[in-house]
């Protein structure tokens, strides 16, 4: 079941869902708007192949900065953080979706990583890209996407209890940690 506005406010008030900082004005009928943080990470252009199993190739050629805005160039891919840190209990999951007004500028918010497991804690790393023919400026603090929350049965092994929870408690845009998986 998708949680609606009053259910979201109630679960936040009772501490079942934690969002920090929380702005009640961002609660929508079926979601909560999230804002763009100020940490951006991207790969410099190059010919070196990124091998997901090789940490060296995943972490080399990376540039990043903290900024009040970022000009996303046509075809550019950048990792960014959400301003909000969230914490989910073991019976609520979330998905992240882009805002339609941002999508109409050609900016995608996530490539495939839109699922947030029960038990997740931390900021959310956004996988942004610009498919527009022109650069698009995005600002730290602007509403950039929305979280949709779903109730589930209690997870037997929620994300915060997994020994291999690679992105638990992340607090900035985080590169892939796929290399920590077994080949």
Curated annotation (Swiss-Prot):
Enzyme Commission numbers on file: 3.5.4.30
Residues marked Important for bifunctional activity (site): 114-115
One annotated GO biological process: dUTP biosynthetic process
GO function terms (MF aspect): dCTP deaminase (dUMP-forming) activity; dCTP deaminase activity; nucleotide binding
Pathway noted in the entry: Pyrimidine metabolism; dUMP biosynthesis; dUMP from dCTP: step 1/1
Listed transmembrane segments: none
Keywords on record: Hydrolase, Nucleotide metabolism, Nucleotide-binding
Enzyme class, UniProt record, top EC level: hydrolase
Residues the record lists as binding dCTP: 99-104, 117, 125-127, 146, 159, 166, 170
Residues at the catalytic site: 127
Catalytic activity: dCTP + 2 H2O = dUMP + NH4(+) + diphosphate
PANTHER family: DCTP DEAMINASE
Subunit structure: Homotrimer.
Family from the record: Belongs to the dCTP deaminase family.
Functional description taken from the UniProt entry: Bifunctional enzyme that catalyzes both the deamination of dCTP to dUTP and the hydrolysis of dUTP to dUMP without releasing the toxic dUTP intermediate.
Designated name of the protein: dCTP deaminase, dUMP-forming
Species the sequence originates in: Methanoregula boonei (strain DSM 21154 / JCM 14090 / 6A8)
Gene behind the chain: dcd
